[in-house]
């Protein structure tokens, strides 16, 4: 039985809020057990996760999604299914690219040992789990000064970032930091080999080498993409993306809006500062007010290589120009919140909700004041515990990549 249900016909995401039909997630595996105090900054974590609790929290998140009838696709299951359906050449290419990209760089001796170890796995699932988790000298039964011969991919539970669903296509990303760049190996593999994904247009390829991550990519409606200029995504990349989209006749977007946000390492994407939760309701962190700046790319009249134009609008007017009516802006922790509450709930990704339908969102229970403010504004909040998951610096939107949504009427 496929990871996709019978309704899934391919990538179809033309909004942030349309009823969620199919979504990609990844429950953190053994890879998070290899995070050590000395490597927190390098591995992009704020603290070491208690892994049993983190997995329980993730299961709660997934259960809430499944309760709504959403087809929840686990990344490992998708990679396994793709691998089992792929040609011998595609399987060999995946393994060789994994070895090429491994961190630390493998010596000839270690490369041979890792390759033999992976090829000896009794199941595809075991092979994939080791590729994600990392491989130790104990696994290989070799002597080495290094304990980890291949580093883990501990951020992979943030499935939002390696690629983004954009209309009927995808952008597959070149990620800012080495620890995450390897994650797109799996994105390239599934979109090149899975029968239900292989014909998906690519609007961005990581080979283009300019940094962009999925937490910065938003589809506000059929006409408008919104992309963050952040700690992880550059304006230069968005300019290249605009050119690629303009050149692709399958893509119907008419406008890209780039939004400048604070360049903080712990709040690294647009979705940690501003999110769309309903047809006219947006959640934002007031901390970003003095940093917000907006550029327009005209994909209709901007020529073959549209350029960014500073539109000079305030946030409310910018959003009105996209949705066609006055937006409701909800600040983190609610109107009149103290600076302390704003900073605390911004820190724990208080804007980073996943909309499962217009005006229905899921996110961490710990951001109590923001949850209350959303409910007061007519948003239904589905809370789940995330005290451990949040230490990886992401909330429900970060931990999900919609693959299909119903269109918003």
From Swiss-Prot:
Active-site feature positions: 398 (amidino-cysteine intermediate)
Top-tier EC class: hydrolase
InterPro entries, A to Z: Arg_deiminase
Catalytic reactions on record: L-arginine + H2O = L-citrulline + NH4(+)
Swiss-Prot/TrEMBL keywords: Arginine metabolism, Cytoplasm, Hydrolase
Pathway: Amino-acid degradation; L-arginine degradation via ADI pathway; carbamoyl phosphate from L-arginine: step 1/2
Annotated EC: 3.5.3.6
Molecular function terms, GO-annotated: arginine deiminase activity
Subcellular location: Cytoplasm
GO biological process: arginine catabolic process to ornithine; arginine deiminase pathway
NCBIfam families referenced in this protein's UniProt entry, alphabetically: arcA
Family: Belongs to the arginine deiminase family.
Record protein name field: Arginine deiminase
Species the sequence originates in: Metamycoplasma arthritidis (strain 158L3-1)
Gene that specifies this protein: arcA
